[in-house]
């Protein structure tokens, strides 16, 4: 994957809240994902999502490394293939003891024909099938690629936000997702494992290590590399955080 140093400065991943088999895995391929340009609302384009629901046994923590594995080995190659057709995209990570459970989502803005191709490629990926067979992934959900239900750039932003924030946020979270994926890529590049012969279990073990290293980078460098520079973009103005107090980074 190409370095994301050309992305808008100050983009940061905030609030990341974000199994066994024996099938061989296809060799990894590097990807090259270009940054977004400004996108106008378009009646022939809209938002779609492909969602992976993980196996999450009771009394165990979420397997966050599964998000990392799927993002890097399933979604990233598709992003590379269709980057000229995808205007904006992002990842969404969540885990709660409800019907969705631990769910990793790839959300993207494109036209109907491209949505169909992108959705089909992800759903029909050999690794997707292996993860389902192994029981690591319970279900893969996707929206009807023939129907645009969320046409505006702001259509998937939080409706409680002011309109300007709704319209700007998709660019922010696009950059956040790219930065996180680049961290994953850089971590993988340092070790360069021979993944072609890995079983599903071995691949999961490897991405558990990758995910841990990415989390450590966030824990040790996130305050300055991400939060401080994000605060700088806004002129070091204070911000109301969850605890309802002002902070600067």
Locations of regions flagged by a protein language model:
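Bacterial N-terminal signal peptides that target proteins for export
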Residues: 1-11
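An acidic, charge-biased composition feature
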Residues: 2-3, 15-249
């Amino acid at each position: 994957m190409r370095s994301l140093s050309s992305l808008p400065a100050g983009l940061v991943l905030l609030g990341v809240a974000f199994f066994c088999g024996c099938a061989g895995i296809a060799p990894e391929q590097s990807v090259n994902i270009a940054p977004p340009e400004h996108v106008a609302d378009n009646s022939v384009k809209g938002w779609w999502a492909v969602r992976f629901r993980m196996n999450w046994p009771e009394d165990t923590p979420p397997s966050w490394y599964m998000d990392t594995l799927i993002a890097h080995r399933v979604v990233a190659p598709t992003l590379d293939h269709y980057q000229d057709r995808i205007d904006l995209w992002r990842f969404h990570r969540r885990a709660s003891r409800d019907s969705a459970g631990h769910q990793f989502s790839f959300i993207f803005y494109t036209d109907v024909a491209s949505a169909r191709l992108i959705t089909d490629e992800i759903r029909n990926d050999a690794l997707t099938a292996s993860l389902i067979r192994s029981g690591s992934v319970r279900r893969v959900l996707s929206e009807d690629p023939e129907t645009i239900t969320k046409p505006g750039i702001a259509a998937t932003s939080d409706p409680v936000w002011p309109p300007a924030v709704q319209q700007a946020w998709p660019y922010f979270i696009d950059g956040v997702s790219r930065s996180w994926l680049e961290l994953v890529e850089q971590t993988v590049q340092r070790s360069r494992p021979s993944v072609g012969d890995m079983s599903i279990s071995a691949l999961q073990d490897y991405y558990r290590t990758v995910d841990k290293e990415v989390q450590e980078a966030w824990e040790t460098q996130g305050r300055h590399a991400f939060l401080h520079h994000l605060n700088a973009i806004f002129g070091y103005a204070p911000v109301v955080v969850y605890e309802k107090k002002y902070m600067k980074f």
